[in-house]
Amino acid sequence: MGFLLSAEQVGQFVSNQWQDPYAVLGPQQIEEAGKSFGLVRALVPNARQVWLVERATGQAYPMQPLHPETLFELRFEPGTPLPDYFLRAQRVWDPQGEHLEEWEDPYRFPLEKVNHIGELDRYLFNEGNHHRIYDKLGAHLITVDGVKGVHFAVWAPNARNVSVIGDFNHWDGRQHQMKRLGESGIWAVFIPGIGPGAIYKYEVKTSWGDIYEKSDPYGFQQEVRPKTGSIVADLNTYTWHDQAWLEKRAATDPLRSPISVYEVHLGSWMHASAEDPPAEGQSVLVDQKPNTRFLTYRELADKLIPYVKELGFTHIELLPVAEHPFDGSWGYQVIGYYAVTSRYGSPQDFMYFVDRAHQAGIGVIVDWVPGHFPKDGHGLAFFDGTHLYEYADPRKGEHKGWGTLVFNYGRNEVRNYLVANALFWFEKYHIDGIRVDAVASMLYLDYDRKEWIPNPYGGREHLEAIDFFRQLNTLIFKYNPGALSIAEESTAWPMVTWPTHVGGLGFNLKWNMGWMHDMLDYFHMDPWFRQFHPHLVTFSLMYAFSENYMLAFSHDEVVHGKSHMLGKMPGDHWHKFASLRALYGYMFTHPGKKTLFMSMEFGQWNEWNVWADLDWELLQYEPHAKLRHYVASLNHLLRSEPALYTQDTKPEGFRWIDCSDHRGIVSFIRYGEDPSEWVVVVCNFTPVVWPNYRIGVPERGFYRELLNSDAVEFWGSGVGNLGGKWTDDWAYHNLPYSLELCLPQLSTLVLKWQPPQPVESQN
């Protein structure tokens, strides 16, 4: 039952001090002096006149102002039913009434009737267990009584008032005020008549009267920077063609599969001229590079995916593609966690990219950043006038070194926001895995901090973040069998890839940062001195099976003055390429999955520059073209030899032949699950050819040379073993037989035993 407004109540309402606009606006039934009558109120800022228009007859009834140019009311006689109607208004800037506006009254659709967010939804969200909260909060296209519109919902528990603003209401927060849904902290409103493409924000009025304009934390699309508005988007219009891929993924154990990842920053892989606009979508210019634009998701699908497939990589890993305001952050300072960046196109365009990758047999991994977020005013920071998403105490809630804020993992709704976000990318965009950035920064309360707050037991372990990771990974694998959850964890935190039920964090892969640093230190040395540091090559095998490791040379290793991979290698031009080939050879035969950052496959000299594309012109030169061919050959070898991947995480998959040769040579055997699947690997990390080098082997017969990094086809010197070697009946290295090999300088050799074939009788 409605009520008549006093002058004081009118003033409060037009200044956005009510939390239930449905109690005031729209159709109301009034009881007064024993009589019942209906009325309709409308809040229309900057209106000269407002009319209620009866839909059936077109009759327009002028509404009376309760507040000048803002709040209007029309009363009906007792017993007169309220008609089906819409509103019409003449604005103050249209004195002649030449551009009258018409719209459906949002407040004639009670939220109880809309029923988009139920009590169970609110309960699960406040508990931190609504795994599909993205289907409820944010902007969603719905139809009520045959009227199409958008249901908006946002969590802002400490706000005095929240409104939706956009072009559809001239960015005036008085017109579309939201209703607070009980004690959940959620505000909601259904706005009829708007649809996909509508730009909007939330106007949040704090408890002390300040007003913030915020992008939608659950918005599916945002404007291209520097604009900051959210965009209504329908994620259900794309028709997928990857069902066979998803079914195969669900039936596949990734730890027993070949995984070789090509890490890509979409904005700097390849550019196009601004004078050559894309066939579809808008042209977004690259900052600091005149007359240059980004490729769109659809253009990248046509160029990047065939390139990756040709090179033989199994997956593409994308540096963050969630919306971020600053290109120079590489995507790691996210504002729109549910919005794929508009720099390269629409959500449907990104779906097309992933779909095309799956059809080509390539998985898609995205970098995900739950560890921190930027302080930009339109983002999550101080969202409702309080520290809503972040910890309030800066000793826990701020990364001084990065200038960012830390999520409050102990708050149910914040944890729900993040966990559901990871699930969202799998469900809506069909991604195959996430790589969680900066895990160590989340696990330690004293990470990069001079002042910090210990946990309740006095330790530095971040117990709330630990619980967050366990919940995250449990749900990822529950809903997405065969998926990847990869941790970038740079310390020796135990059990990162162990199951949660035995006390682990639940990831299924972890970057091996120790191996990466050891190998770069080793290969940076003059080759003559490597013999004095064999531990840098062998130490990783002391712990290689304590976790499920991925060996990665990532974007972080080719920036900030570290030089690119070739620049890290000593010696002249030829020796740099030879050392890099030997390193890649060791990487692809060492236990663990593989990741290479873009441009490493052809040996770029310049460091990675986010404002420029790769130095593709280098491929016209033989050394670079042949290095790329070598990487493709390594990928082919990896995928064709089960010994190199089926037991990556098991000690049974590896055996040293000799790890103590002071000449900078190591040799070992990789075993597959099938006892007949095994290969021999010999690495010579010094610039000396060893023509009569003997190693022990377990079987008699012929050993075919599968790979020689010094082959002429890879721009090597051509020294080798003429395709293979026969064994000698000479025990060596505690093995019953041996091979006498010619070891090229700075090389990796891979050999495979050929079982003896029975000789057919001539009779």
Swiss-Prot record:
Pathway: Glycan biosynthesis; glycogen biosynthesis. Its EC number is 2.4.1.18. GO terms for molecular function: 1,4-alpha-glucan branching enzyme activity; cation binding; hydrolase activity, hydrolyzing O-glycosyl compounds. It catalyses: Transfers a segment of a (1->4)-alpha-D-glucan chain to a primary hydroxy group in a similar glucan chain. The keyword Transferase applies. One of its GO terms (cellular component) is cytosol. It is an enzyme of class 2 (transferase). The active site is at D437 (nucleophile), E488 (proton donor). Belongs to the glycosyl hydrolase 13 family. GlgB subfamily. InterPro entries: A-amylase/branching_C, Branching_enzy, GlgB, GlgB_N, GlgB_N_E_set_prok, Glyco_hydro_13_cat_dom, Glyco_hydro_13_N, Glyco_hydro_b. Disulfide bonds: none annotated. Keywords: Carbohydrate metabolism, Glycogen biosynthesis, Glycogen metabolism, Glycosyltransferase, Transferase. Catalyzes the formation of the alpha-1,6-glucosidic linkages in glycogen by scission of a 1,4-alpha-linked oligosaccharide from growing alpha-1,4-glucan chains and the subsequent attachment of the oligosaccharide to the alpha-1,6 position. This is 1,4-alpha-glucan branching enzyme GlgB. Pfam families: Alpha-amylase, Alpha-amylase_C, CBM_48, GlgB_N. It comes from the Bacteria. It comes from Synechococcus sp. (strain JA-2-3B'a(2-13)). Monomer. One of its GO terms (biological process) is glycogen biosynthetic process.
